[in-house]
UniProtKB/Swiss-Prot annotation:
Enzyme Commission numbers on file: 6.1.1.11
Pfam families per the UniProt record, alphabetical: Seryl_tRNA_N, tRNA-synt_2b
Subcellular location(s) of the protein: Cytoplasm
UniProt: ATP binding residues: 272-274, 359-362
InterPro entries per the UniProt record, alphabetical: aa-tRNA-synt_IIb (IPR002314), aa-tRNA-synth_II (IPR006195), aa-tRNA-synth_II/BPL/LPL (IPR045864), Ser-tRNA-ligase_type_1 (IPR002317), Ser-tRNA-synth_1_N (IPR015866), SerRS_1_N_sf (IPR042103), SerRS_core (IPR033729), tRNA-bd_arm (IPR010978)
Record organism: Glaesserella parasuis serovar 5 (strain SH0165)
Gene Ontology biological process terms from the UniProt entry: selenocysteine biosynthetic process; seryl-tRNA aminoacylation
Pathway: Aminoacyl-tRNA biosynthesis; selenocysteinyl-tRNA(Sec) biosynthesis; L-seryl-tRNA(Sec) from L-serine and tRNA(Sec): step 1/1
Stated name of the protein: Serine--tRNA ligase
Catalytic activity: tRNA(Ser) + L-serine + ATP = L-seryl-tRNA(Ser) + AMP + diphosphate + H(+); tRNA(Sec) + L-serine + ATP = L-seryl-tRNA(Sec) + AMP + diphosphate + H(+)
Binding site residues for L-serine: 241-243, 295, 395
EC primary class: ligase
Length: 434
């Protein structure tokens, strides 16, 4: 959520930035009207409160003099009713303002390039050289099915499209990847491993910005057909990313600045409806309703967040480098960033079968956007004032897409897969999956 004071002091400028950089039309007239109503009701409530307090003091003095106070009591009661009504109206207007604020995207950092979509992202760097094959390249689906490790029909039978069952060496490789990532981040990058719920409530989803704008992208709990109609329905949603529960651990907290940065990592399944992705990546593991991800989250002091973004992105890059997977680093343009981000780097891994780079990690500085929604603050020692923290998150990495990259980049002519060197300790001595 952006700072409401920005709308009060620089409304036209903010509206222009949102239009230019986010293609978002801020309703300036509505914002102005609501702010005028808020001010008027605030003044009215304050005046009524002051007058009521003054009349209440008069009642005490009149009573001490033995005077009839019935008229004064009536006046105070009337003012009390008017004050209550004004407060109700003020709360209503403030709720409308908050709802409006919750639907406004974050303002991009100054260095973020202006652009409409991913075609205008900027390549920052590349690492590694794509392997040259002397045999016909197979995609990960052909490889996985040939090894008996990817069973998409079973996923359809159990649940539906965009689900998969993994078996044998492929399932173990998938597990090895997540363990390797967690070990790297906790042992070398300073993150604390965290286990979190996979179901979260309404407040948690508001805190990180999934609600109210992106409810259709979530899987919500509800009774199945034929279930007892008297069953209690729990108002939960499955997490779309571990960013949601992990970041919300600091919701409504005041952290000691000396304890920052707070660096947390979690391996979880993620659940997404892919509501806007109909017809895209229908083959294979690239776009699933359920996939695993190792997430990195940092909570930092405001002046440290841009430095932290470079560090966090470097941690994601290290995973790819140790796996010897070629990738490129992209700075997202304003039109391709997520709703709550102020600056984002995407890492795109080389997939030989597609002959292109595909996103495998997104690392974002959310600035104080999430912190304001969550009221996550910090305070320096000896300082009475608090300030909002800055939050960052990044994939370190998406496990399923990393599996895709390993299968395709480490394939052999006979359809077997050579296990990357750094994963061998996690594979129980298996060096080739065949």
């Amino acid at each position: 959520m952006i700072d409401q004071n920005l709308l009060r002091t620089n409304l036209e400028e903010v509206a222009q930035i949102l239009k230019l950089k986010r293609n978002f039309n801020l309703d300036v007239a509505r914002v102005t009207s609501l702010e005028e109503q808020r001010k008027a009701l605030q003044v009215k409530a304050e005046n009524l409160q002051a007058e009521r307090n003054a009349r209440s003091k008069n009642i005490g003095a009149a009573k001490a003099r033995g005077e009839d106070i019935s008229a004064l009591l009536t006046e105070v009661d009337t003012m009390g009713s008017e004050l209550d009504a004004a407060k109700v109206e003020l709360d209503k207007v403030q709720a409308e303002i908050r709802e409006l604020l919750l639907n406004i995207p974050n303002l991009p950092a100054d260095e973020v390039p202006v652009g409409k979509d991913d075609s205008e992202n900027l390549e920052v760097s590349r690492w590694g050289t794509p392997r040259q094959f002397d045999f016909e390249i197979k995609d990960h689906v052909t490889l996985g099915e040939g090894l008996g490790g990817l069973d998409f029909p079973a996923g359809v039978k159990l649940t539906g499209s965009r689900f998969v069952v993994m078996k044998s060496g492929i399932a173990r490789l998938h597990r090895a990847l997540s363990q390797f990532m967690l070990d790297l981040h906790t042992e070398q990058h300073g993150y604390v491993e965290t286990y979190v719920p996979y179901l979260v409530n309404h407040d948690t989803l508001y805190g990180t910005g999934q609600l109210p704008k992106f409810g259709e992208d979530l899987f919500h709990t509800q009774p199945l057909d034929g279930q007892d109609p008297n069953a209690v329905q729990k108002p939960y949603a499955l997490i779309p990313t571990a960013e949601v529960p992990v970041t919300n651990l600091v919701r409504d907290e005041i952290l000691d600045e000396e304890s920052l940065p707070l660096k947390l990592t979690a391996h979880t399944p993620c659940f997404r409806s892919e509501a806007g992705s109909y017809g895209r990546d229908t083959r294979g593991l690239i776009r699933m309703h359920q996939f695993d991800k190792v997430e990195m989250v940092q909570i930092v002091a405001p002046e440290k967040s841009m430095e932290a973004l470079e560090e966090l992105t470097g941690h994601a890059e290290k995973v790819l480098q140790l796996l010897n997977l070629p990738y490129r680093k992209m700075l997202l343009c304003s039109g391709d960033m997520s709703f709550g981000s102020s600056k984002t780097y995407d890492l795109e891994v080389w997939l030989p079968a597609q002959n292109t780079y595909r996103e495998i990690s997104s690392c974002s500085n959310m600035w104080d956007f999430q912190a304001r929604r969550m009221q996550a603050r910090c305070k320096a020692k000896g300082d009475k004032k608090t300030r909002l923290v800055h939050t960052l998150n990044g994939s370190g990495l998406a496990v399923g897409r990393t599996l895709v990259a390993v299968l395709e980049n480490y394939q052999n002519a006979d359809g077997s897969i050579t296990v990357p060197e750094v994963l061998k300790p996690y594979m129980g001595g298996v060096e080739v999956i065949k």
